[in-house]
Amino acid sequence: MTHYIQGQWHAGKGHDVASMNPANTHTIWTGKTATAEQVNAAVDAARAAQFDWFMLGFDARLAIVETYRSQLEANKAELAETIAQETGKPQWETATEVGAMIGKIALSAAAYNKRTGTEANDTPAGRAVIRHKPHGVVAVFGPYNFPGHLPNGHIVPALLAGNTVIFKPSELTPKVAELMVSLWDKAGLPAGVLNLVQGEVDTGKALASHPQLDGLFFTGSSRTGHFLHQQYAGHPGKILALEMGGNNPLIIKGVQDIKAAVHDILQSAYISSGQRCTCARRLYVEQGEQGDALIAMLADAVKQIKVGPWNSQPQPFMGSMISETAAKGMVAAQANLLNLGGVSLVELTHLEAGTGLVSPGLIDVTAIDALPDEEYFGPLLQLVRYSDFDQAIKLANQTRYGLSAGLLADSREDYDYFLARIRAGIVNWNKQITGASGAAPFGGVGASGNHRASAFYAADYCAYPVASVEADTVSLPATLSPGLSL
């Protein structure tokens, strides 16, 4: 059970791959990658199934998707544990991820009807009707940080709209993908409607470049997203939806309850071991005694964050990063910032060789003149002290990204001022910036995406509008155009 093509499970014909629990390096999944021929077979299966899937109609498609929701409910404990073991995230957090997957079904159905349903109006020219049709065959590339929820957020609306899908998950989370697709199979999804190909870069390239794709929906790094954007530049007929990362700012201004502010900072910067695309990377705190007090409390709170394996009891706030490589990357990022003039307030350390376990870090980068505009994808928060609000907003906007941003402030006037000037697709006030609603769009500007917001707006890129003017019979107009006689 590695690849799912035309409703059947197949062994891979490529090279050996394995998935390890990043908290203890135990191997939890093995398989072989999909070859280009197997990718072709998956695309062919999706193409053959697409028209019949569309012609079932929305209600019939929804019934199958709702059966999948029932499968998620029945298997939520196993799915949450699988996500925890493969990503290293604590069990409390993976349970919330599965809950989000279940909730996505109703939200996606509502979004389909609201964003891409059918509307008819009588006009003097005839009955004007707006309908929506699926693009056809689409690929979904999933990330490792939310290996269930984020690809689910593409797959469910794509299927509801009548598309067929080839799912290529992260090579770091193949077991989660296999379990997800097995639940779709149990839900009675017709053969070829959803196909799974596992693999690394070569598999991804074979799928992304396939001439029979009508679209590709991607969640992942800005680097890979930009590569896909370049690849699709000469194909205006294909829909490309990119959901990428961010170098996200959080500004603190005039907050009286600094304990509450510290809580929101911790939730913004360190949840999921900093491996959320919306995590705060840069923290802007006012100069002065109040800012000093907040930073002192924050540093103490960061030192007290509990870190541990996915199954530790009592449960930790932070689990493992996705791999030892990722952990070492964060140590290197911290060293680079220190070399540039940063001052460590709480040192990020690699806790155990061979694992992805790291402690959270806090570094004052105020003295760095040219702060690197990088998304350091882990639990390292960069602190900048500012003298006035306009300076803070200017610094916050000094990024090529534009995913999330936030303001913790007691003044509504300050928030309105901030909201009008900050450049980001997700802007929160007095809430953690990792908090997003599935009933709202999710996406950013700049290097964070290509204006294809997901979540509630995923329906928009899963179908295209068809405008019609209709009449029940062919009839001669009462008045002919000048120059015509009949």
UniProtKB/Swiss-Prot annotation:
One of its GO terms (biological process) is arginine catabolic process to succinate. It is an enzyme of class 1 (oxidoreductase). Keywords: Arginine metabolism, NAD, Oxidoreductase. The keyword Oxidoreductase applies. It catalyses: N-succinyl-L-glutamate 5-semialdehyde + NAD(+) + H2O = N-succinyl-L-glutamate + NADH + 2 H(+). The active site is at residues 243, 277. Pathway: Amino-acid degradation; L-arginine degradation via AST pathway; L-glutamate and succinate from L-arginine: step 4/5. Pfam families: Aldedh. NAD(+) binds at residues 220-225. InterPro entries: Ald_DH/histidinol_DH, Ald_DH_C, Ald_DH_CS_CYS, Ald_DH_CS_GLU, Ald_DH_N, Aldehyde_DH_dom, SuccinylGlu_semiald_DH_AstD. Its EC number is 1.2.1.71. One of its GO terms (molecular function) is succinylglutamate-semialdehyde dehydrogenase activity. PANTHER family: ALDEHYDE DEHYDROGENASE-RELATED. Catalyzes the NAD-dependent reduction of succinylglutamate semialdehyde into succinylglutamate. Belongs to the aldehyde dehydrogenase family. AstD subfamily. This is N-succinylglutamate 5-semialdehyde dehydrogenase.
